[in-house]
Every structure is written in structure tokens, then in C-alpha cells.
């Protein structure tokens, strides 16, 4: 019998083992859909970003006007701009759900896949930050100034490092030009890193809600899960289209509709909503260097998850006390997001400090302690 082309062709064979004949646990829920929604978000960002880059001018005197020109004069330019801006928000919604699922069901025990995933999160955050600077509105300019200036907290090399990033003595034309370059190149670095993430995932196979070995109960990815993912694509793209057409500026900042000027500071400098939880942790530490370290650790703490997992059970499905603290962590992160968008005054300062302390406490102390306690109670 002639061999099936998808199993014999060198290129199609890779696609076949990754997306068609891939053995998949039958009991994975819709929480596993977010992993496949992320490449859709990435492709949408690259496609819209490419067309926007054709009309955008990375120059301080023209950047704001070029964005206005895209929205007013370019055919469907307003839609491209809105899809790109809101696409970033949907990207982060999918990322946070994907990480949340990984934490809940113990997916972090696939160490290589998890660590590459955390690196991907850092890359996506960096891309979102440099992309937010490009429209050159007030919040873009001051956000770039404040966040890049944090590097000056580094001992000895701090001020040199900041000037090296800026390309001068302040955020100016050189900064905007390099940020545009970074925004473009980082998307492709993310795409390459995603393939490595997928490669490591397919070495072990997917986990499942029970956290048990599922080798006895697997089906091929296509058609069962490919159609399930297709439903996710339709919902995601539909929601993105609705937001981008009916309420395109809902998640943006009004200050960014004012052209950047170094002569007046906005009343409250803050990043986009998806970075607010880390920004709140940064602000809750009164020392500059301490704040920068806390900001980095708020993401880096995810690297500790495979090390601090002390329970004999993988998934939180069978761990009621740990489950309660997982939801406490989610609530705490939402509180931090809210605090990051508030002015620096009481009671917001105190709430931010308590929430920041609790955030690290849950990751570093409470989760490993609960694992040991549950092992003892369950006698395993």
C-alpha cells in the first residue's frame, strides 16, 4: 500500500505529528484551548503590525501624526490600529488564562516547557511595552521615561545603561526608532520561541485535569480537538472584532490622545492594564532598587513553581486547601491590577503593600507548606 503523504513527506510529517496524529488525552477541558488561541493572537498581531508599519513613521515629530493619518486616510486603517491595540489585550487575557491553567493543573512539572513559557511571557511583556511607546502620546512618552529610568537603579552601570537604551540624555528620536525596531523583531523572536515551547510540550505530551497518566486514554488531535480549537478561534476573533468596532478605546488611556510633550506630566503615569499588577508591586516598595527587583521577581517567581511543588498530587483538583489559596492568588492579582491604576496615596499604598506581600508569600511559602501538610493528612 502506498504511504500516506502526510506521514512520509519530510515537512508534512512534522505538521502531522504536531497537529493531526498527535495523541491527546480525551479529558482535557476548554482551559486547554488557550494554548492554541495564543498563536492566533500572535499571527493577528504580526499581520496587523506589518500593515501598520507600512504607514507609520518612527520619528518624534511625525509619529503621532502618522498614527492619526492611518486612522483617517488609510483604507480601513482605523480597523487595523484598533485590532492591533485590542489584539494585545486579548493576547494577555489568553496568556493569563493559560498560565492560570498551568498553575491549577500542575503543568509546571513539565519543567522545560514551563521555563520556556515564562521566558515567552517576559518577551511578550517587553514587546507590549515598546509597542505602547510608538503612538508617541503623553502616556507613551512618560511611560517610556519612567520605566526605562528604573534601570538607573542598577549599581555602578545604571546611568550608563539608561543613556545607552535612550540613545541620548532623554527619551527622544533615537529611543523611538530603536523601540520600533524592537517591537518588530521581538514578535518574530516570540514566534521562534513558541516553536521551542511546542517542541518541548510534544516530548512529554499534554497533561490533563486529573494530573494522572493518560497513556491508556488518548485520541488523535484531529478531528476531535482541532474542531474544539476552531470554536475557540471563532469566539476569540468575534470578541476582538466586536470590541475593536463598538468600543475600540475602552481599554486605552485618554492621555494617549494628546501628543507627547516633555513640558507637562500626566496626572497619573501608568502602563496598559495587563502590566498593572507588576507596576503595583514595583510601586509598593519605597526603595527604587527594591522596587525594580520586586518587579522582576513578580514574573521570575514562576520559575520557582516546579521547585516549590511539594505535594504528591499534581493537580489542584484533589487538593481543596491549595485550591482555596490558588483562588486567593487570583483575587490578589486582580486587586494588584486595580491598585496599579490608582493614584499613589492612602489607602491605595497600604493595600498595594499588603497585596504585594501576599502575592510572594503564596508562591514562596504557602504553596510548598500546604503540599507537605496535605501529604501528611492524606498519608501519602
From Swiss-Prot:
Alphabetized GO MF terms: metal ion binding; ubiquinol-cytochrome-c reductase activity
Note describing how the cofactor binds: Binds 2 heme b groups non-covalently.
Residues that coordinate or bind a ubiquinone: 202
TM region(s), chain numbering: 34-54, 78-99, 114-134, 179-199, 227-247, 289-309, 321-341, 348-368
Family annotation (CDD domains): cytochrome_b_C (cd00290), Cytochrome_b_N (cd00284)
Membrane-related topology note: Multi-pass membrane protein
Record key words, sorted: Electron transport, Heme, Iron, Membrane, Metal-binding, Mitochondrion, Mitochondrion inner membrane, Respiratory chain, Transmembrane, Transmembrane helix, Transport, Ubiquinone
Family matches, as InterPro entries: Cyt_b/b6_C (IPR005798), Cyt_b/b6_C_sf (IPR036150), Cyt_b/b6_N (IPR005797), Cytb/b6-like_sf (IPR027387), Cytochrome_b (IPR030689), Cytochrome_b_C_euk/bac (IPR048260), Cytochrome_b_N_euk/bac (IPR048259), Di-haem_cyt_TM (IPR016174)
Chain positions recorded as heme b b566 binding sites: 98, 197
Residues at which heme b b562 binds: 84
Gene Ontology cellular component annotations, sorted alphabetically: mitochondrial inner membrane; respiratory chain complex III
Pfam families: Cytochrom_B_C (PF00032), Cytochrome_B (PF00033)
Cofactor: heme b
Subcellular location as annotated: Mitochondrion inner membrane
Signal peptide interval: none
Function: Component of the ubiquinol-cytochrome c reductase complex (complex III or cytochrome b-c1 complex) that is part of the mitochondrial respiratory chain. The b-c1 complex mediates electron transfer from ubiquinol to cytochrome c. Contributes to the generation of a proton gradient across the mitochondrial membrane that is then used for ATP synthesis.
Other remarks on this protein: Heme 1 (or BL or b562) is low-potential and absorbs at about 562 nm, and heme 2 (or BH or b566) is high-potential and absorbs at about 566 nm.
Entry similarity comment: Belongs to the cytochrome b family.
Assembly and interaction partners: The cytochrome bc1 complex contains 3 respiratory subunits (MT-CYB, CYC1 and UQCRFS1), 2 core proteins (UQCRC1 and UQCRC2) and probably 6 low-molecular weight proteins.
Protein name: Cytochrome b
Amino acid at each position: 500500500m502506498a504511504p500516506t503523504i502526510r506521514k512520509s513527506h519530510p515537512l508534512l510529517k512534522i505538521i502531522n505529528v504536531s497537529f493531526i496524529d498527535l495523541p491527546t488525552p480525551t479529558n482535557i477541558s476548554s482551559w486547554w484551548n488557550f494554548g492554541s488561541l495564543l498563536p492566533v493572537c500572535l499571527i493577528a498581531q504580526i499581520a496587523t503590525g506589518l500593515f501598520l508599519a507600512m504607514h507609520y513613521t518612527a520619528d518624534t515629530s511625525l509619529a503621532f501624526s502618522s498614527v492619526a493619518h492611518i486612522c483617517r486616510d488609510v483604507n480601513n486603517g482605523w480597523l487595523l490600529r484598533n485590532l492591533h491595540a485590542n489584539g494585545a489585550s486579548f493576547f494577555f487575557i489568553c496568556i493569563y488564562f493559560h498560565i492560570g491553567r498551568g498553575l491549577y493543573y500542575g503543568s509546571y512539572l513539565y519543567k522545560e516547557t514551563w521555563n520556556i513559557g515564562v521566558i515567552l511571557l517576559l518577551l511578550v511583556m517587553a514587546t507590549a511595552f515598546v509597542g505602547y511607546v510608538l503612538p508617541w502620546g503623553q502616556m507613551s512618552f512618560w511611560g517610556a521615561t519612567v520605566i526605562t529610568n528604573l534601570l538607573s537603579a542598577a549599581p555602578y552601570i545604571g546611568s550608563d545603561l539608561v543613556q545607552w537604551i535612550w540613545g541620548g540624555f532623554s527619551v527622544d528620536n533615537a529611543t523611538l526608532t530603536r523601540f520600533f525596531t524592537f517591537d518588530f523583531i521581538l514578535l518574530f523572536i516570540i514566534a521562534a520561541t513558541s516553536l521551542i515551547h511546542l517542541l518541548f510540550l510534544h516530548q512529554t505530551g499534554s497533561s490533563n485535569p486529573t494530573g494522572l497518566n493518560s497513556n491508556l486514554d488518548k485520541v488523535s488531535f484531529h478531528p476531535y480537538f482541532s474542531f474544539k480549537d476552531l470554536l475557540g478561534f471563532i469566539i476569540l476573533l468575534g470578541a476582538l472584532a466586536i470590541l475593536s468596532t463598538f468600543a475600540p478605546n475602552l481599554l486605552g488611556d485618554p492621555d494617549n490622545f494628546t501628543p507627547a510633550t516633555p513640558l507637562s506630566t500626566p496626572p497619573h503615569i501608568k502602563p496598559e492594564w495587563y502590566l498593572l499588577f507588576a507596576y503595583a508591586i514595583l510601586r509598593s516598595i519605597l526603595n527604587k532598587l527594591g522596587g525594580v527587583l520586586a518587579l522582576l521577581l513578580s514574573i521570575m517567581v514562576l520559575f520557582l513553581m516546579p521547585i516549590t511543588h511539594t505535594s504528591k498530587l499534581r493537580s489542584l483538583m484533589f487538593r481543596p486547601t491549595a485550591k482555596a489559596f490558588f483562588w486567593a492568588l487570583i483575587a490578589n492579582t486582580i486587586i494588584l491590577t486595580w491598585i496599579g491604576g490608582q493614584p499613589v496615596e492612602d489607602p491605595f499604598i497600604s493595600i498595594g503593600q499588603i497585596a504585594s506581600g501576599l502575592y510572594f508569600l503564596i508562591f514562596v511559602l504557602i504553596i510548598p507548606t500546604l503540599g507537605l501538610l496535605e501529604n501528611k493528612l492524606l498519608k501519602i
